């Protein structure tokens, strides 16, 4: 009881001070609420940035990844020689390596004909370069000329691709080159591009005729079971240019 009496007076005094000027109280409360909103907005922006930056890398099926040392980001890579990736096979802990090609290109909406930029991924269909079942199940089909897979998590401005495929209206243009969309997969957009397309390395070269199979953007490296990623990474850094 004594404790309650001791606590009652300071609480009552504090409350009186708060409500003495109700206008200032409301302004202070609004200020605190606005600050909280800003904090949560910043957290949301941070999470969105992280999710968009990692949407593609986490879907690649590899233990280590090789890029040019001057590349600023995965979506802005600098090409390097495919032979440099092949040199990684000289390390006994490296089980296999696969090249990956990337390029930004305009995609024509099948219905509106409006073009919007997306990211095109080219890979060897004989390899399992992605941790995406929908892509791995279509590897044989991607060996056919002018075939691509479309990311259904792309922005809606690209059109209702799933419905158009079902209606056999699956032909469009990427970088003014005619291609057939033969299926869908799920990856996610990034700040670099509003959508994604995956195709074979040969079809990639048809879309980007100035590119060469000898110059790659990302090297996917798979290690033997039980190998230390940290140790192999250090060894490859010394071996490769």
Task: Name every feature range the model reports, one short phrase each.
Residues 60-62, 93, 114-119, 144-146, ...:
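Envelope-exposed proteins and targeting segments
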Residues 74-79, 110, 114-117, 128-132, ...:
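Solvent-exposed, non-transmembrane alpha-helical starts
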Residues 82-86, 90-91, 95-149, 175, ...:
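The feature marks short, hydrophobic/small-residue-biased sequence motifs that occur predominantly
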Residues 125-133, 150-167, 207:
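Short, solvent-exposed hinge/capping segments at secondary-structure junctions
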Residues 34, 45-82:
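Membrane-interface junction motifs in transport/secretion proteins
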């Amino acid at each position: 009881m004594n404790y309650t009496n001791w606590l009652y007076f300071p609480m009552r005094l504090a409350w009186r001070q708060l409500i003495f000027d109700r206008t200032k109280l409301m302004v202070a409360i609004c200020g605190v609420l606005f600050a909280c909103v800003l904090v949560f907005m910043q957290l949301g922006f941070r999470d969105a940035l992280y999710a968009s930056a990692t949407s593609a890398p986490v879907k690649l099926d590899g233990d280590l990844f090789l890029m040019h040392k001057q590349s600023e980001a995965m979506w802005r890579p600098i090409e390097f020689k495919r032979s440099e990736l092949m040199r990684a096979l000289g390390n006994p802990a490296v089980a296999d390596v696969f090249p990956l090609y990337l390029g930004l290109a305009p995609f024509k909406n099948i219905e509106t004909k409006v073009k919007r930029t997306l990211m095109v991924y080219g890979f060897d269909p004989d390899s399992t370069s992605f941790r995406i079942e929908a892509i791995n199940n279509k590897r044989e089909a991607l060996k056919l000329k002018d075939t691509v897979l479309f990311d259904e998590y792309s922005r809606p401005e690209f059109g209702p691709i799933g419905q158009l495929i079902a209606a056999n209206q699956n032909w469009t243009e990427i970088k003014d080159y005619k291609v057939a969309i033969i299926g869908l997969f799920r990856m996610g957009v990034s700040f670099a591009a509003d959508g994604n397309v995956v195709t074979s390395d040969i079809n990639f070269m048809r879309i980007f005729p100035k590119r060469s199979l000898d110059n790659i953007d990302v090297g996917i490296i798979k290690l033997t079971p039980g190998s230390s990623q940290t140790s192999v990474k250090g060894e490859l850094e010394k071996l490769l240019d």
